[in-house]
């Protein structure tokens, strides 16, 4: 056998093999590789979109959290203000109540002073009349009694 014929036979076999691989097997692998590239690209795009969505969600959650903090601070502020107003109203009401009680006590004291004064005047006038009866040695009639009482009350 001649090496040229063998070489030509091997070249022919190689060409048939090359043609078969190019027409049948290579397109399958090319399709598989292309499909994988497409899936990988889609996965990367989805990962980028998911990353952006996560960043957006974090941003929104921060905004919501800051709004919630502001609302909570506002609610606490309003509650403190209402509590202060309630305390002020309670103090004012207590002040008015105590002033009214003090005024009522003053009025009651004045009434008691007048009553005691009137009782003392009556007792004093009876003592004076009794003393005058002893000094005069006679009983004082109603007209004299009224006149003496009137004079004594004017002096007091």
Curated annotation (Swiss-Prot):
GO terms for molecular function: proton-transporting ATP synthase activity, rotational mechanism; proton-transporting ATPase activity, rotational mechanism. It holds the Pfam family ATP-synt_B. It is found in: Cell inner membrane. The keyword Transit peptide does not apply. NCBIfam families: ATP_synt_b, PRK05759.1-2. PANTHER family: ATP SYNTHASE SUBUNIT B (PTHR33445:SF1), ATP SYNTHASE SUBUNIT B', CHLOROPLASTIC (PTHR33445). F-type ATPases have 2 components, F(1) - the catalytic core - and F(0) - the membrane proton channel. F(1) has five subunits: alpha(3), beta(3), gamma(1), delta(1), epsilon(1). F(0) has three main subunits: a(1), b(2) and c(10-14). The alpha and beta chains form an alternating ring which encloses part of the gamma chain. F(1) is attached to F(0) by a central stalk formed by the gamma and epsilon chains, while a peripheral stalk is formed by the delta and b chains. This is ATP synthase subunit b. It comes from Dichelobacter nodosus (strain VCS1703A). The gene is atpF.
